[in-house]
């Protein structure tokens, strides 16, 4: 399916481009996913597709139409690649739940649902985590970071410009850092050591600080408020 793209800001920049979309089934057994893209967002939906892997992509380009697949499989790892100069590829992938995800994208939002361990970076774009079952380490230079239903053994979230909002479902240590934006965390009841730093903003901390607590909440922003509370349980 092919369509002319509209004028405006796209992942390729400010230009009129052409866009096409396609779908591909991945027959190989996939044990992990690695992001290796330039411009374009990535959405991974774990637990979809009945255990199979399906790759949907939307490619916006200027000049000659890019040919061939932009994803590949290396030793069981699904690698989501880019499409070259003046081109952006946006992925939506359905895959089994619990697969680890790593890698980076230069420019684009990253949305991960029901995956395993996460270690990803985007140069510019929001990062959204939902139902992550492993340790999560995420970084963006310009974008908001949100995470809900996180059940791993630790969270590290860093952004230079954006808010951070995290709600884990299991007690774990959290390190959240932003240069410009508010930080909000809501954690299950557990013993926490609480460290907060802000140069310009209010603090609303209702999580009890226990110096010998097993878990550590380390929250830092240069410009923004910090809120740390406990999730209400019935």
Predicted regions and their residues:
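Active-site alpha-helical segments that house and flank conserved acidic catalytic motifs
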Residues: 33-36, 103, 120, 138, ...
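Short, surface-exposed interaction patches in beta-rich subdomains
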Residues: 147-234
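Short acidic/polar N-terminal linker immediately downstream of export determinants
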Residues: 1-65, 83-92, 202-212, 233-234
């Amino acid at each position: 399916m092919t369509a002319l793209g509209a004028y405006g800001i796209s992942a390729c920049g400010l230009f009129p481009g052409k866009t096409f979309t396609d779908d591909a089934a991945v027959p190989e057994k996939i044990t992990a996913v690695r992001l290796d893209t330039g411009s374009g967002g990535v959405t991974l939906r774990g637990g979809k597709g009945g255990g199979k892997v399906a790759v949907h992509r939307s490619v916006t380009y200027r000049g000659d139409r890019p040919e061939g697949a932009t994803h590949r499989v290396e030793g069981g790892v699904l690698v989501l690649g880019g499409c070259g100069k003046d081109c952006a590829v946006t992925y939506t992938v359905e895959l089994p739940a619990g697969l680890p995800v790593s890698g980076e994208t230069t420019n684009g939002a990253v949305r991960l649902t029901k995956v395993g361990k996460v270690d990803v970076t985007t140069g510019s774009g929001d990062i959204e985590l939902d139902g992550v079952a492993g340790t999560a380490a995420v970084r963006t230079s310009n974008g908001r970071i949100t995470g809900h239903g996180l059940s791993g053994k630790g969270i590290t979230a860093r952004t230079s410009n954006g808010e951070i909002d995290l709600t884990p479902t299991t007690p774990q240590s959290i390190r959240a850092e932003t240069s410009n934006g508010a930080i909000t965390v809501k954690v299950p009841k557990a013993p926490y050591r609480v460290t907060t730093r802000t140069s310009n903003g209010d603090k609303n901390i209702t999580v009890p600080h226990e110096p010998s607590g097993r878990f550590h909440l380390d929250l830092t922003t240069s410009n923004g408020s910090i809120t740390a509370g406990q999730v209400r349980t019935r």
